Amino acid sequence: MDIVFTSGDTFKEGIGISKGLMKRDLISMLDVKEDLEEIIDRGIDIKRKAKSGMSIEQLKGKTLGMIFEKSSTRTRVSFEVAMEKLGGHALFLSKNDIQLGRGETIEDTALVLSRYVDTIMYRAMSHKAMRELAKYATVPVISGLDDKEHPCQVITDLMTIKEHKGKHKGLNLVYIGDGGNNISHSYLLGCGIVGMNIRIVSPRKYWPDSYYVNEAKKFGINVEITDKIEGATKDADVVATDTWVSMGDESKKEQRLKDFQGYTVNDKLMKNAKPDAIFLHCLPAYYNYEVTKDVAHGKQSVIFDEAENRMWAQIAVMVTFMK
């Protein structure tokens, strides 16, 4: 039978999106405020099933395009292995592999990739670029990090907390370090959504953007921003930190290391937390700067569970957004 195309036909507006349906992006924690707990529970359930030998191939025939403007260990490996376990395929694209790195517009890149892949994962230099790609892509866009937020990491951390604590609501999370980075911002929103109280402990010049503080407070949780490290971990159920020098801040490394002196998570701070408190770090860790190795590899640390859960949490995200 001959196939006849009419003038009204379009080819692959977005191969993962049926015509008439709204696509869904994960750019901010606020994008999952209605179903965050459901996604976390899905990740825990899929992890359990996979480890018991059950198939989790829920995305057969699906392709994830991964754009990396920043280097990565965990983000790349976790997304690639996740797609393999789901029965799909992941395509790695560094900025040097595609024309985006040579001046092609984000708009054209988004429109073209939307014709080839079912979802785009973007690890971006800027939140502005992330928003622009999502604006023009006709398939879902999942953030692998930008300069303002890191939603996949905080979904991972909340999954890890639930595995170890059994709940979120009413717990106290203390984040020590760079309060103005993407992890801190996403913690504020994520804790708000699940009902955890949060204390950000950071030098004043590195406090979070007021937008994220105000959004977190709208959820009715206790939000404290302080530069006082003494007693900072009192009543903490979770203690978290991150590198003092994020990618893109290398030119400011010397000044940052001076500014953050005294904010190292050490045994004393962990002993001042609750006896069953856990320690989180998204890695890579720089020992004796943001955390001592004794803490990072100590009995309260769950950082390697956390690292593994990047894969399971992202599996849950992709099943939610791509299936």
Where on the chain are the PLM-derived regions?
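Positively charged, low-complexity intrinsically disordered leader regions
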Residues: 3-77, 81
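Phosphate/diphosphate ligand-binding glycine-rich loop within oxidoreductases
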Residues: 51, 57-162, 287
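Glycine-rich phosphate/diphosphate-binding loop of Rossmann-like nucleotide-binding domains
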Residues: 69-82, 165-241
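Short, structured coil segments at secondary-structure junctions
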Residues: 86, 116, 136-137, 194, ...
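A short, gly/pro- and small-residue-rich
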Residues: 130-146, 251-273, 298-300
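Rossmann-like adenosine-cofactor binding region
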Residues: 217-293
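Adenosine-phosphate binding glycine-rich loop
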Residues: 276-277, 282-323
